[in-house]
A protein has these predicted regions:
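Beta-strand-rich domains and repeat architectures in extracellular enzymes and scaffolds
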Residues: 31-63, 77-89, 237-241
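Beta-rich, blade/repeat-based domains predominating
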Residues: 38-49, 81-92, 121-135, 164-178, ...
């Protein structure tokens, strides 16, 4: 109960601090849902054709999963117990899968899953996506690191700001053309960010929906997970019972 209270208070304070008065808030409509494995501590979510790829976290429980829309697991790969998995993204024949504090990212064969390699990342790994020929990684700060695929060096940094002030706790990421969608850790918000400027255009506010869900599922954790199927967005969270199609 104390943990839940602290999390609730933190979310309220963080949400208030992050959203500036002149920045629009939009409440998306929930238009559909599909089942989600509630034991999955969601860290990354994206579509690969008609399949959903999900990467999960927690020590001893981290892995990557290929699943159908009705929840059938088609493929999976688990990390060693010493790794805490984070965000992921597919590029070409590979899936790149971050770890939290190990300063490592794994290269996984896209289909079928198998471990291909590993490379070093300079900070904690949080969220991961792909934009303009480079990986785009969040690390809990307000800066997005651009990581080149040829050698995996940092080739650029994009600060994310709202009203000229840094927006921190950037977590799971999804890019559609030149717009970034970023979960803000410990809030019920998704920041919609213009690239390459890093300017927040608006926030998607899921606070009412999350409050409703928590009444029925007190064990669920924070909003985290954004996937775009080419037409619609799907969102979920850590240990959530459903993945939701949303429109805004």
């Amino acid at each position: 109960m104390i943990s839940l209270l602290r999390r609730t208070l933190f979310c309220a304070v963080a949400g208030a601090a992050l959203v500036f008065a002149d920045t629009p808030r939009v409440v998306p409509a929930i238009v559909d849902s599909i089942p989600h494995e509630q034991t999955h501590f969601t860290q990354g979510l994206f579509f690969d054709g008609k399949d959903l790829i999900e990467s999960t976290g927690q020590y001893g429980e981290s892995g990557i999963y290929r699943r159908t829309m009705d929840g059938k697991i088609l493929d999976s790969l688990r990390l060693a117990e010493r790794y805490f998995g984070e965000g992921s993204v597919a590029v070409g024949d590979d899936i790149f899968y971050l770890t939290w504090k190990s300063h490592k990212a794994f290269i996984v064969n896209r289909k079928p899953f198998s471990m291909k390699g590993v490379f070093r990342i300079p900070t904690e790994g949080w969220g991961l996506t792909y934009w303009r020929d480079a990986l785009l990684m969040s690390n809990g700060s307000h800066e997005l690191l651009q990581i080149g695929l040829g050698g995996f060096a940092v080739v650029g940094v994009i600060p994310v700001t709202d009203g000229g002030k840094p927006v921190k706790q950037l977590n799971e990421l999804e890019v559609v053309r030149d717009t970034l969608y970023a979960n803000l850790w410990m809030t019920d918000l998704i920041a919609v960010v213009e690239l390459p400027s890093g300017r927040v255009l608006k926030y998607l506010d899921f606070s009412a929906k999350v409050a409703e869900l928590r009444k029925r599922n007190p064990g669920m954790d924070v909003l985290n997970g954004i996937a775009f199927d080419g037409k619609d967005f799907w969102i979920t969270g850590k240990n959530w019972p459903q993945i939701y199609k949303v429109r805004f």
